[in-house]
Amino acid sequence: MNYIDLLKTSAKKTNNCACMGLDPIFEAIPNKTGMLKDNLVSFFKELFDTMHEKNLVPAAFKPNIGYYSALDKPREKDFSGSESLAEILSLIEKHFPGIPVILDSKRGDIARSSLNYAIEAFDGWKADAVTVSPYMGSDSILPFISEKYLDKGAYILNRTSNPGAKDFQNLKTDSEGKNNSELYIEVAKKIAFYAKEFPGTGAVVGATGMEELKIISGIYAQAGEVPMLIPGVGSQGGDAKTVMEVLKNSGCNLALIRINSSSALTHPWKKAPVPENYLELCINNIEKLLSETAINGISF
């Protein structure tokens, strides 16, 4: 089964195109044990147990590796963050079999270095897909999508959800005025080109720029099967219902879309003290996202 098939199968299984981001801030997680690793793992186990009981299953999970590696202290032989992520991934396999894991690491380097990062993601972490920066060009991207990793997914940063995205991504590509398209449009065209030869090549497109999303989703709808990972829903201000409407109007295959929300699902209280009903708050937001990203009646 290649990554396109995995996306379609998991969308059909869950009846949604939601992605649950797993980006824990240690200070915002209930402190029941006093131990970093035990706290993180026990929190996600409790959350996953409840989701499983209520049959709340998103169509993907996306841990951002930076939130875990930042908790490691390698020089002190302390790998609590990485060990936590390993156990959390095992919990996902147990509770939600067949649901893809997207390792959000935004890698991209010269060819051999990118191959090492691909090995890290796919052989080390056993991820199904990874996020990749396109800035260094094709030789930095191809190790993630060709040869031994043809059945994996790679989401290339296209038009991201952060405020600074416009600094580079919206720049005009031709100062002579012959071609006035923004850089993100040219990146989208290149991603569509890669996707024809390497199935599983996808794009990261933020939920915070609707005009850009309309343009990009139109490009991918015409290109064929191009997966999209759409972060920015929830705390960053993006709205899942609006995103779904744009995607439907563009003609995109919703089975290949994953709309991501992270902190709004795992610690919606943000910097406030952890409330007693923390689990209920998380579950309510998860239910809301799954409902807003439901894909009833689509063709797989």
Identify the meaning behind each predicted range.
Residues 14-18, 56-59, 97-99, 126-128, ...:
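Short, well-ordered coil/turn segments that N-cap beta-strands
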Residues 25-26, 31, 109-204:
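Conserved anion-binding
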Residues 70-91, 110-114, 135-150, 208-219, ...:
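Active-site-adjacent beta->alpha loops and helix N-cap segments on the catalytic face
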Residues 208-260, 264-268:
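A C-terminal functional module that forms or caps the active site or interfaces directly
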Residues 243-252, 256, 265-300:
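C-terminal helical cap(s) of enzyme catalytic domains, especially alpha/beta-barrels
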